[in-house]
Amino acid sequence: MELLFLALLIFIMAVALGSGYPVAFALPGAAIITVLLAAASGYLLASDVSAYFHTGGPYEWISAGVLNLRGVYWEVERDTLIAIPLFIFMGIMLQKSKIAEELLITMAKLFGPVPGGLGISVVFVGALLAATTGIVGATVVAMGLISLPAMLRNNYSPSLATGTIAASGTLGQIIPPSIVLIILADQLASAADQAGAMRKALHKQVTGEISMPSVFDVTSTSAGEMFLGALVPGILLVLIYMAYILGYSLLFPKNAPAVENDEGFNKAFYMKVAITLVPPLALIILVLGSIIAGIATVNQAGAIGAVGATVMAGYKTIPENSGRYTPAIIVVASLIILGVAISNFDMNIKAASSAEDFLGIYIGLFGTAGLLVGIGWSFVRVLKVDDILNDVMLETSKTTALVFIILLGAAMLTSAFRAFGGEEIVKEFLSSLPGGFWAQFAIVMLVIFILGFFLDFIEIAVVVVPIVAPILLADPSANITAVWLGVMIGLNIQTSFLTPPFGFALFYLRGVAPAVVKTIQMYRGVVAFITLQLIALVIVGLYPPLVNYLPNRSSLLSEAAPPPRNPRLQFCLDQFVTDAIAADQGATMAAINAAKTISVDDMPKFIGKSIEGSTESAEEALAALAGIQIAADAVQDAEAGYRPQLTLVRGLEKQIRNIAEHRDKLAKQASRMNADNPERAEIEAEVAHMSDEIAALESQIPDNWEAAHDTFKKLTDAESKARNSYRRSGDTAWNDAAIILATLDATPAFIALESDLNALRPVLETAEFEVAEDAAKALERSFRDLEGADDVKKALGKVKKAMSKRKKDRETALKEYEKALAAYADQLVWRAAAETQVRPGVQVYLNAIKGNIGARSQEDLTREQALFLASCTSHHKDLSLNF
């Protein structure tokens, strides 16, 4: 019955919306009516008002609906909704002051005779507005107020115009900074933790190993990564829109005519372009940049946009005169003064102590006063000229009320959807779905698409994502990243906001569109853009580097980049080294052979052994590197026959685990019942049936499975062994040679200790034992910190021991001191000789292996390595063969 009322909920809502009933009342009305019908049916048919609810009853769910409704405007976590009226104010102010229209028209003129130029400029401006708001409602409303009148005046097809505006407005879902991306990042971070635990449990079940290698962990995400990941898909979507409008205008020129540029492309025109185009774009860039740089929150950026729009309106709404730009000039000059003060002075008034500190504060106060004067002057202007400020405030209030009442209705609808088990149905269905990751992923995308018909994007992010994301992220066969999943969900949510008849973007636009534009024209206009969004969704889905590359690049090139030894980088770093060795045309091998010829005559034994050990390890590393490819090819050859068996067996085992879990719950439930309870017998019979079902599934596992699994595991173990062997040899090759160079680099410090060493003799001869012991100890510590000075350090250690309280043997101490002097003299000789005899060859050798087999031993990645790894790690690597 819950399913019946869930279907009834959707049906009532569809009928109400289809009949033209206001959306603000259709959404909560459908929820309340369905809940009351379910309660009445339960009372009449089952004598229980809660009978036809998934959990709870009508009282609980109506209360939950009220709480959801209150949460739209009261929850601290949803303070970003405050930005909606601010950005609406900005858009309406731009429209009233004609700045936005001039911006769109000027950009269209720049395209000249290109058909569809105004539509293309609308997409571009829409993308910029989306980048400032990140909120669908505010962006769609702002674009509807700014763009639609201009397009209709230029004889654009109402369908193309409304479709372009609705699609451009929803770019706020995917173009950063976006509120939905921040929410998704938070939810996906938690989901990644759950998925990591699920993957570890799966690894333990199928392999029997207690711990899972860290390279198999689920990749989490952050808001910053989500912004970077969504940037390229957002730009891709904008380019697809522009290409479509251009193609459409070429096929149907009457529906998207070119905007004539009667002024011509002369110096005066370009000056007008600069005056018209630069200030609004600078405002948009300022709003977006303040968010990305972390200077302002979304709400603060909205305030910046509202004030900036007012300042520009202050000089646009009055006729040409000598003082037209005065308020704007004061604002810009004040900002420059504040920037200079902040950059050159400590502006903390509590910490100010010097005249210079107070000078900076006075400059800042002067700049602030100027800023307030300029802003206030602009507000007075727009208040006095045609009563623009009053009109803007009134329109902002009306539009804000429209947007928020839709959000309130969506909150009530969400409560009803939960009441009838919509969430649980989705979760259980997804968990039991066969067909592997991509079947599950397709279903999830479809579910999110459908839920987007009647759920706010925030509700989808906080309700649906926690349910489905852990299941998708935990699957080792796809091994997707959380940032890719988040961007895909963001693109999907954006698509669903355009879907007739329930797309919220359409309702937002309908609220501001003139009556001449029919609703059916809006529906017809968005169909093409829905198709374009689905194409973009498929492109991003098929090519994950579009999402993953920028976050990886940013991470690997940052100051906090992971070191080359990071386990997650090893597979791709091995590939980088393989390619580098293949491309160097034997230069590395030649460097190894040259290192073997370095003369170590009259050098201490450790130098010769280090060079010999390093070159041998380097040759072993090269051989192991070739062995990796052989082992990997063997795994790949065997994979074709092993993977179908693996997929079959893991699928059967998954079914067995699910049935066994359900069976154990029923068995536990039966054990708590009385023996004479008739339900116990039914449950026990069901438990027995499930046991038979498990046995039947186990019988389907091929008899040769264990042998096939063991054989394939030997191949994967051989590949792992080859990789580990290469890495050990490469590390040894670098470290052994690097010790020699570190020893020679310590020579200046070694020479600097000669005076201290000579000064120790009189101390040993005449000073108190305790004083002499401390002096020897300090000098020993100094030599201990130098590479290659062990023989001197050991002799000084014996000196210290002889002068200790227990020994107090001055004669022995002086003998050991003479040995230290002799060792020091010997070192001076061979260190001087090594500077010309050993250092050049070792330095050339280390330079030759630094970027390949010695890469793991470096402190940081080179730019070339980081870029390669960013590209390599952007692809999703199938890990299912290890599970």
Question: Where on the chain are the PLM-derived regions?
Answer:
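Alpha-helical transmembrane segments of multi-pass membrane transport proteins
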Residues: 1-883
